[in-house]
Amino acid sequence: MTKIRKAKETMSAKERVLRTFAFEKTDRVPIDYATNGSIHHRLCVELGIPGDNYDLLLEALGVDYRGVAPAYTGPLLYPPLPGRQVDPLYGFYTRWVENESGGYHDFCDFPLQGADEETIRAFPFPSPDDFDYDAALEQIKRQKDYAVYVGNPGTGDIINSLDYARSNDNG
């Protein structure tokens, strides 16, 4: 088991991030964490973190940020496909692709590939009423010592999001 050695910290994660965005001096550079499942698992094993526990790993790494999101509670909008995962919000399909590092989920079965305007207009999207905002508020309260963000790197990424639904050739 590997142990991460960190320098003594003199400020909270939230203070560090706020100072960084204000272009003020901090005790260290703020840290975030995002990876695929295979690498996450290997990192947890190496650090002796049981059950691939995400929160324990964030603590071990000294991650300053915590993401929050309201849970989707609405109806199933997209049909399940054998051997695939489907994104419940946007209808993106992924399949497991093995590689020498373990593997990853890659986009496939593009639901709007070759679709005409009418099909695109009729494509279902979740209603804002189908989310548990109270649970998101509780997440925020639990993360009060961290810099909290909503969304993910793909939230504002219109071009890649179109590719996930229409394919690289049609995005």
Question: Language-model segments: which ranges?
Answer:
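Catalytic cores of TIM-barrel enzymes
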Residues: 2-171
